[in-house]
UniProtKB/Swiss-Prot annotation:
This is Glycine N-methyltransferase. (6S)-5-methyl-5,6,7,8-tetrahydrofolate 1 binds at S4, Y6, R242. The lineage of its organism: Eukaryota, Metazoa, Chordata, Craniata, Vertebrata. It catalyses: glycine + S-adenosyl-L-methionine = sarcosine + S-adenosyl-L-homocysteine + H(+). Inhibited by 5-methyltetrahydrofolate monoglutamate and by 5-methyltetrahydrofolate pentaglutamate, inhibition is much more effective by the pentaglutamate form than by the monoglutamate form. Two molecules of 5-methyltetrahydrofolate are bound per tetramer. The binding sites are localized between subunits. Inhibitor binding may preclude movements of the polypeptide chain that are necessary for enzyme activity. It comes from Sus scrofa (Pig). Catalyzes the methylation of glycine by using S-adenosylmethionine (AdoMet) to form N-methylglycine (sarcosine) with the concomitant production of S-adenosylhomocysteine (AdoHcy), a reaction regulated by the binding of 5-methyltetrahydrofolate. Plays an important role in the regulation of methyl group metabolism by regulating the ratio between S-adenosyl-L-methionine and S-adenosyl-L-homocysteine. Disulfide bonds: none annotated. It is found in: Cytoplasm. Pfam families: Methyltransf_31 (PF13847). Its EC number is 2.1.1.20.
Length: 295
């Protein structure tokens, strides 16, 4: 494992199988504070996602990286039928708590939440009776949490195969990743605010790139987050944790997605929710892939 050469995660985080980088509980707690609730989502992101789903007539949505449930909650509140899964039980507990607290609301009583692994997603999540979900979403740089342990991206291909198998014919896959092209060429993330969250708790993010045999193998982000009420006499304290990501570049990830769809899909790429053109002046923080299954 790469942990023998370079510490990829905060101490206490699981290292076997599909890694749960939030398994120590502390990272999950601080992350929940950072991302906040649905009110912390940017208006641009909310309008874009809801508009996209409604434009394509999507009703049944599978969130394959729901984390604390912030996107799923937003979709449930907006009238979508949502199934939410994540590999981290420490993250899921926040979603489960929200469902319990709002169980008297019919939409939340019907909200399905399961622990699931991308490597066995086809077995963990029953496929919709309609042949799949209208839309499958994997947002917030979530897919990059999956490392390339074997060095051949076979885990990535299997995970994408399983994820795309959940999409019905005519349905959508919405999946994103950070602009790792820029990170690898400059050593730091593009400037600008997070396009997903309005949080003001982040004090610093330090970027590191791990290279193995002259190939970028991993990007780590060391977060320093201001946590209210944890310092001296109730003042804000600082919490630090590290998350590691596989650096998916735009061209190679596009190829992985097209292979997963077997060439049967309409594929568009956006940079920070706007149509992206290679060489454009604006450098996006995130690339968002929208694929429609046409088989």
């Amino acid at each position: 494992m790469v942990d023998s050469v370079y510490r990829t995660r905060s101490l206490g985080v699981a290292a076997e199988g599909l890694p749960d980088q939030y398994a120590d509980g502390e990272a999950a707690r601080v992350w929940q504070l950072y991302i906040g609730d649905t009110r912390s989502r940017t208006a641009e992101y909310k309008a874009w996602l809801l508009g996209l789903l409604r434009q394509h007539g999507c009703q049944r949505v599978l969130d394959v990286a729901c984390g604390t449930g912030v996107d799923s909650i937003m979709l449930v509140e907006e009238g979508f039928s949502v199934t939410s899964v994540d590999a981290s039980d420490k993250m899921l507990k926040y979603a489960l708590k929200e469902r319990w607290n709002r169980r008297h609301e019919p939409a939340f009583d019907k909200w399905v939440i399961e622990e699931a692994n991308w490597m066995t997603l086809d077995k963990d999540v029953p496929k919709s009776p309609m042949g799949g979900f209208d839309a499958v979403i994997c947002q917030g740089n979530s897919f990059a949490h999956l490392p390339d342990c074997r060095g051949d991206q076979s885990e990535h291909r299997l995970a994408l195969k399983n994820i795309t198998s959940m999409v019905r014919s005519g349905g959508l896959l919405v999946i994103d990743h950070r602009n790792y092209d820029h990170i690898l060429s400059t050593g730091c993330a593009p400037p600008g605010k997070n396009i997903y969250y309005k949080s003001d708790l982040i004090k610093d993010i330090t970027t590191s790139v791990l290279t193995v045999n002259n190939k970028a193998h991993m990007v780590t982000l060391d977060y320093t987050v201001q946590v209210p009420g944890t310092g001296h006499r109730g003042s804000p304290g600082l919490s630090k944790f590290r998350l590691s990501y596989y650096p998916h570049c735009l061209a190679s990830f596009t190829e992985l997605l097209q292979t997963a769809f077997g060439g049967n899909g309409q594929h568009s790429v956006l940079g920070d929710f706007k149509p992206y053109k290679p060489g454009q002046a604006y450098i996006p923080c995130y690339f968002i892939h929208v694929l429609r299954k046409t088989d």
